[in-house]
């Protein structure tokens, strides 16, 4: 919560327009409350629950991170700016480093765009795009933020197709 407030204040005071915040690195020695092993080791050791379809202990950290992300968005939404809030006027791009932590999968990486981007972003959409390059989300974020980017990525990950479903006309 403290970091969420500090980042929001930095944006509100115009001390920064862009930031990168890493909650925890994939190989950091982060402990999940109630666990004796570090998070990274749990991702490898914990079996996938056959009924749930995921690793419940591993998912606890994801839940805590999402709570922090939600707190950050609330901080942005609480700051009045112009005819709306700071959240209405900015764009936040959040993502995980893997789709399935146990094997460090790069497929189905959860990615989120939040905020109104000054009216350029149509929030509230879930886009499921199996087999698509994750760089499409990055290109979309750049264009929503007003960057003159026509393409992004390299090799097989190169794309010139933003996700237009989330872009206001």
Put a short name on every predicted segment:
Residues 1-169:
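Ligand-binding pockets and gating/stacking loops
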């Amino acid at each position: 919560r403290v970091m969420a407030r500090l980042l929001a204040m930095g944006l509100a005071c115009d001390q920064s327009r862009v930031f990168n915040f890493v909650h925890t690195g994939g190989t950091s020695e982060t402990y999940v409350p109630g666990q004796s092993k570090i998070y990274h080791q749990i991702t490898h050791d914990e079996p996938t629950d056959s009924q749930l379809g995921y690793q419940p202990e591993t998912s606890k950290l994801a839940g805590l991170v999402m709570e922090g992300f939600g707190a950050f968005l609330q901080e942005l939404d609480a700051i009045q700016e112009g005819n709306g809030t700071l959240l209405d006027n900015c764009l936040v791009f959040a993502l995980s480093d893997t789709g399935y932590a146990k094997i460090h999968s790069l497929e189905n990486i959860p990615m989120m765009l939040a905020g109104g981007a000054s009216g350029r972003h149509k929030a509230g959409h879930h886009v499921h795009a199996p087999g698509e390059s994750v760089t499409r989300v990055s290109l979309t974020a750049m264009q929503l933020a007003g960057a003159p980017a026509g393409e992004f990525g390299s090799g097989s990950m190169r794309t010139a197709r933003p996700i237009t479903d989330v872009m206001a006309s």
